[in-house]
Amino acid sequence: MSIFFLLLGLLLQAPAPAASLQPAPGNPIVVIETSMGTITVELYKDQAPVSVANFLQYVRDGFYPGTVWHRVVPGYVIQGGGFTEDLTEKDTRPPIQNEATNGLLNRRGTVAMARTRTLRSATSQFFINLSPNPSLDHTGFSPDVFGYAVFGRVIEGMDVVDRIGAVKTGSKDGMDDVPLVPVVIKAVTEKR
């Protein structure tokens, strides 16, 4: 009987299985192949329709292959989708509406549109949150607190995101937090 209680106690102390990251039916899935591994992302088409349509158009246009994760801040974000390996900025379509008011939060593993201080300046660049970043959430209507529009989440490959988030960085061509060895986006494909 005491062995039963010992085993029961050990079972109760065991960590719970990881929460399932199953995508919602109908949400688009995109696979990002990088020089460090593959990241699979679910896109929130209902909560962020403008951002998702914009991102998917860049995917369908073949815009992202050859771009790099040009900004890596450990414990914060990895950002990419706008510069080539030599840090040449790619030409983009016009900026889109900022959907930061959609109620989605910048939690670990979420994907959001990058922008400048101008509220409607997001084009092709996006970032993945390495940790919860409430300072990036919408809390008001001035540029400092308007927030960054979350439009998806990583459902596979967060280990790859974390490895990218741990690369050595420095300054290059007037930009900070640039990986010393380029981390290249090799392909981005729409899975569904």
What is the role of each PLM region?
Residues M1-G9:
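Sec-dependent signal peptide recognition
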Residues L8-R192:
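Cyclophilin-like peptidyl-prolyl cis-trans isomerases
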